[in-house]
Amino acid sequence: MSDQSSEPLDSSLRQAVVPDSAAGRRFDAVLAELFPEFSRSRLSEWIKSGDALLDGETARPRDTLRGGETVQVQVVLETQTHAAPQDIPLNVLYEDDHVLVIDKPAGLVVHPGAGNPDGTLVNALLFRDPNLAAVPRAGVVHRLDKDTSGVMVVARTLQAQTALVEQLSARDVHRQYLAVVVGALVSGGTADAPIDRHPRDRLKMAVRDDGRDAVTHYRLRERFRAHTALECRLETGRTHQIRVHMAHLKSPIVGDPLYGGALKLPKGATDTLVAELRGFKRQALHAETLEFLHPVSGEPIRASAPVPEDLQRLMSALREDSARAAELARR
């Protein structure tokens, strides 16, 4: 807006001067630019509750400014989560005062809920940084399924949370996944199919004409005899998106308990591959890279999470099985 910025008067009161360039504009719009660390909805609530004052007086969101007014905001940061902090180890890939980037292991639930009241990522985050209790969802701005591993970004401040949510909404956050699917695909492509809740099974999502738009781009990373390793890039971020799209394409993700169907063993598979496929009890899906703009500096950040051991073993077994089949075919 200009070089005018808000300044803390104490732990809960912020003040700023409306620049002359804002003359003729609405109070709520200018307030959002003066205090970008807070969401528009939160600022609107504070205007209505009288916690955002214009020259010491209450004002309406639509009131027109003339420039030069003093704005004061009484920050009311109620606790956003009542989850208990728990000392759960986190694999941190990047950290500063505004964001935390982690490599989430498979098996770790993100949010507490029915069946998982604790032992979640949120519990771990609150132990690492108690201030996250005042940030919506303890700073979690996107999620990974329990049994999907890989990179996630967490906002440590309201300003970071607001900026990252805006980037996600604008589809400016780039996410790439490694997926091992059933079937030897011959080419990559794009799955452009809307997704919504399954009409009968409430635990599942499904491709539906009346669903929300969902787009997944995928390309071949490595072909095996009866499976394929794909690099999947999300354009949207629907629940179970890659899992649903791959199942819709008749190439479900290996080990997927919801969408994978019955276990399929390639004819003549090596004993090692049979053991790996039978023992792989989660979807073979890993969030490998995440790219976003730093919510404060605007600098691009690219974080990568290494392929976990279970997926490495699975791909190694698939590779060996394919090599053995090729050798037998040459005889």
From Swiss-Prot:
UniProt cross-references to InterPro entries, sorted A to Z: PsdUridine_synth_cat_dom_sf (IPR020103), PsdUridine_synth_RluA-like_CS (IPR006224), PsdUridine_synth_RluC/D (IPR006225), PsdUridine_synth_RsuA/RluA (IPR006145), RluA_PseudoU_synthase (IPR050188), S4_RNA-bd_sf (IPR036986)
Active site: 145
One Gene Ontology term of the molecular function aspect: 23S rRNA pseudouridine(1911/1915/1917) synthase activity
Cystine pairings recorded for this chain: none
Reactions performed catalytically: uridine(1911/1915/1917) in 23S rRNA = pseudouridine(1911/1915/1917) in 23S rRNA
Ranges for domain S4 RNA-binding: 25-97
EC number(s) given by UniProt: 5.4.99.23
GO BP term, example: enzyme-directed rRNA pseudouridine synthesis
EC class name: isomerase
UniProt entry keywords in alphabetical sequence: Cytoplasm, Isomerase, RNA-binding, rRNA processing
Isomerase keyword on record: yes
Principal location: cytoplasm
SUPFAM superfamilies noted in UniProt: Alpha-L RNA-binding motif (SSF55174), Pseudouridine synthase (SSF55120)
One Pfam entry name: PseudoU_synth_2
Any GO CC annotation of this UniProt entry: cytoplasm
Localization (cell): Cytoplasm
Known function: Responsible for synthesis of pseudouridine from uracil at positions 1911, 1915 and 1917 in 23S ribosomal RNA.
Protein name: Ribosomal large subunit pseudouridine synthase D
Organism: Xanthomonas campestris pv. campestris (strain ATCC 33913 / DSM 3586 / NCPPB 528 / LMG 568 / P 25)
Gene: rluD
